[in-house]
């Protein structure tokens, strides 16, 4: 599945999601229809979330997909094995993965991204510098759709290592 995502289009548009939703409706696939309706509603909510309407870009749609994925994964973690809600979330996650951009979860790749970003921005690692670190790291981590549940412990470990070295 990961290989498939490499050659597939990187960005998902709201139009593509709506086409898939219409196909699911036509085929009578209620679970797929439910997931797609929910994603489209969340994306449309972002479009009108401020005082003025913003354009629903591919980036916003992808951000919505990644947020929805995280919500499902968190729900799966909270439910015991075999629980009906967990089974439902797992099914929804399988459907979502078809549309969701690849999320960076590999610790080594995330650590490399963190180190490169800090070096490129000439930011020193340290607890007193954490605000500045996060200011440069967050956009880079979000751009790569890095899993923040993996990234934050790496950042905290790097800070503790830097403090113990000094």
Please give the residue ranges for each predicted region.
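Charged, compositionally biased, marginally structured helical/coil segments
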Residues: 2-166
């Amino acid at each position: 599945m990961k290989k498939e995502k490499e050659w597939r289009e990187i960005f998902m548009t709201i139009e593509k999601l709506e086409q898939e939703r219409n196909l699911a409706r036509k085929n009578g696939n209620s679970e797929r229809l439910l997931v797609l309706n929910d994603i489209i509603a969340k994306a449309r909510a972002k479009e009108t979330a401020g005082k003025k309407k913003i354009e629903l870009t591919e980036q916003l749609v992808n951000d919505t997909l990644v947020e929805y994925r995280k919500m499902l994964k968190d729900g799966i973690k909270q439910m015991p094995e075999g629980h009906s809600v967990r089974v439902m979330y797992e099914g929804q996650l399988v459907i979502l993965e078809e549309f969701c951009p690849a999320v960076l979860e590999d610790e080594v790749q995330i650590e490399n991204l963190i180190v490169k970003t800090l070096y490129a921005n000439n930011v020193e690692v340290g607890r007193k510098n954490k605000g500045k670190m996060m200011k440069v790291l967050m956009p880079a981590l979000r751009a790569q759709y890095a899993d923040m549940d993996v990234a934050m412990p790496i950042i905290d470990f790097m800070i503790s290592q830097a403090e113990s070295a000094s």
